[in-house]
Curated annotation (Swiss-Prot):
GO terms classed as biological process: immunoglobulin mediated immune response
Gene behind this protein: IGHV4-30-4
The protein's name in its UniProt record: Immunoglobulin heavy variable 4-30-4
Listed Gene3D superfamilies: Immunoglobulins (2.60.40.10)
Secretion signal span: 1-19
Stretches for region Framework-1: 20-44
Keywords of the record: Adaptive immunity, Cell membrane, Disulfide bond, Immunity, Immunoglobulin, Immunoglobulin domain, Membrane, Secreted, Signal
PANTHER family per UniProt: IMMUNOGLOBULIN HEAVY CHAIN (PTHR23266)
Length: 118
Protein backbone atom coordinates (compact mmCIF):
# COMPACT_ATOMS: atom_id res chain seq x y z
CA UNK A 1 0.00 0.00 0.00
CA UNK A 2 2.90 2.36 0.69
CA UNK A 3 4.12 1.93 -2.88
CA UNK A 4 0.68 2.72 -4.29
CA UNK A 5 0.39 5.84 -2.12
CA UNK A 6 3.82 7.01 -3.26
CA UNK A 7 2.89 6.40 -6.88
CA UNK A 8 -0.32 8.38 -6.51
CA UNK A 9 1.59 11.27 -4.98
CA UNK A 10 4.02 11.27 -7.88
CA UNK A 11 1.22 11.31 -10.42
CA UNK A 12 -0.64 14.09 -8.64
CA UNK A 13 2.37 16.25 -7.85
CA UNK A 14 3.00 17.97 -11.21
CA UNK A 15 -0.50 19.50 -11.42
CA UNK A 16 -0.36 20.50 -7.75
CA UNK A 17 3.03 22.12 -8.11
CA UNK A 18 1.96 24.08 -11.18
CA UNK A 19 -1.23 25.34 -9.55
CA UNK A 20 -0.29 28.71 -8.05
CA UNK A 21 -3.80 30.13 -7.89
CA UNK A 22 -4.91 31.12 -4.41
CA UNK A 23 -8.38 32.12 -3.23
CA UNK A 24 -9.12 34.23 -0.17
CA UNK A 25 -12.55 34.83 1.31
CA UNK A 26 -13.44 38.09 3.02
CA UNK A 27 -16.54 39.44 4.70
CA UNK A 28 -18.24 39.86 8.06
CA UNK A 29 -17.89 37.11 10.62
CA UNK A 30 -21.44 37.54 11.85
CA UNK A 31 -24.72 38.50 10.22
CA UNK A 32 -27.98 39.03 12.07
CA UNK A 33 -31.09 37.01 11.19
CA UNK A 34 -33.06 38.38 8.21
CA UNK A 35 -30.03 40.31 6.96
CA UNK A 36 -27.97 39.61 3.83
CA UNK A 37 -24.65 37.81 4.00
CA UNK A 38 -22.10 39.28 1.60
CA UNK A 39 -18.79 37.56 0.95
CA UNK A 40 -16.03 38.22 -1.56
CA UNK A 41 -13.40 35.86 -2.90
CA UNK A 42 -10.20 37.37 -4.24
CA UNK A 43 -8.23 35.30 -6.73
CA UNK A 44 -4.46 35.73 -6.84
CA UNK A 45 -1.75 34.06 -8.87
CA UNK A 46 -3.85 33.94 -12.01
CA UNK A 47 -6.63 35.66 -13.88
CA UNK A 48 -10.22 34.79 -13.08
CA UNK A 49 -10.88 35.15 -16.81
CA UNK A 50 -8.30 32.64 -17.99
CA UNK A 51 -8.93 28.94 -18.31
CA UNK A 52 -12.14 27.00 -18.42
CA UNK A 53 -12.97 27.23 -14.72
CA UNK A 54 -16.09 27.64 -12.68
CA UNK A 55 -15.76 29.64 -9.48
CA UNK A 56 -17.81 28.20 -6.65
CA UNK A 57 -19.16 28.92 -3.21
CA UNK A 58 -19.49 26.05 -0.75
CA UNK A 59 -20.45 25.95 2.91
CA UNK A 60 -20.15 23.55 5.80
CA UNK A 61 -22.63 23.79 8.68
CA UNK A 62 -21.31 22.77 12.10
CA UNK A 63 -21.06 18.99 12.37
CA UNK A 64 -22.31 18.45 8.83
CA UNK A 65 -20.90 17.84 5.37
CA UNK A 66 -20.14 20.28 2.61
CA UNK A 67 -23.03 21.92 0.80
CA UNK A 68 -22.55 23.40 -2.65
CA UNK A 69 -24.13 26.85 -2.99
CA UNK A 70 -23.46 27.71 -6.61
CA UNK A 71 -20.90 28.71 -9.19
CA UNK A 72 -20.16 31.40 -11.74
CA UNK A 73 -18.16 31.46 -14.95
CA UNK A 74 -16.06 34.54 -15.72
CA UNK A 75 -18.58 35.52 -18.41
CA UNK A 76 -21.24 35.82 -15.71
CA UNK A 77 -23.12 32.57 -16.30
CA UNK A 78 -24.34 31.14 -13.00
CA UNK A 79 -25.86 28.00 -11.57
CA UNK A 80 -27.31 27.76 -8.08
CA UNK A 81 -28.26 25.00 -5.69
CA UNK A 82 -32.03 24.71 -6.23
CA UNK A 83 -32.66 24.69 -2.48
CA UNK A 84 -30.99 28.11 -2.11
CA UNK A 85 -31.70 29.63 -5.52
CA UNK A 86 -34.32 32.12 -4.37
CA UNK A 87 -31.90 33.71 -1.88
CA UNK A 88 -28.53 33.47 -3.62
CA UNK A 89 -26.73 35.80 -6.00
CA UNK A 90 -23.19 35.13 -7.21
CA UNK A 91 -21.45 37.80 -9.26
CA UNK A 92 -18.00 38.30 -10.77
CA UNK A 93 -15.78 41.36 -11.15
CA UNK A 94 -13.03 40.49 -13.59
CA UNK A 95 -11.38 43.90 -13.21
CA UNK A 96 -10.74 43.14 -9.52
CA UNK A 97 -10.21 39.40 -10.04
CA UNK A 98 -13.00 38.73 -7.54
CA UNK A 99 -16.29 36.91 -7.31
CA UNK A 100 -18.91 37.45 -4.66
CA UNK A 101 -21.75 35.76 -2.82
CA UNK A 102 -24.90 37.34 -1.48
CA UNK A 103 -27.29 35.26 0.60
CA UNK A 104 -30.44 37.08 1.65
CA UNK A 105 -32.81 36.58 4.58
CA UNK A 106 -30.36 34.51 6.58
CA UNK A 107 -31.53 32.35 9.47
CA UNK A 108 -29.82 30.13 12.03
CA UNK A 109 -29.93 27.35 9.42
CA UNK A 110 -27.41 29.32 7.36
CA UNK A 111 -24.80 29.12 10.11
CA UNK A 112 -21.74 27.60 8.45
CA UNK A 113 -18.17 28.09 7.39
CA UNK A 114 -18.25 29.48 3.85
CA UNK A 115 -15.57 28.67 1.29
CA UNK A 116 -14.80 29.79 -2.21
CA UNK A 117 -13.27 27.31 -4.61
CA UNK A 118 -12.29 26.76 -8.23
Amino acid sequence: MKHLWFFLLLVAAPRWVLSQVQLQESGPGLVKPSQTLSLTCTVSGGSISSGDYYWSWIRQPPGKGLEWIGYIYYSGSTYYNPSLKSRVTISVDTSKNQFSLKLSSVTAADTAVYYCAR
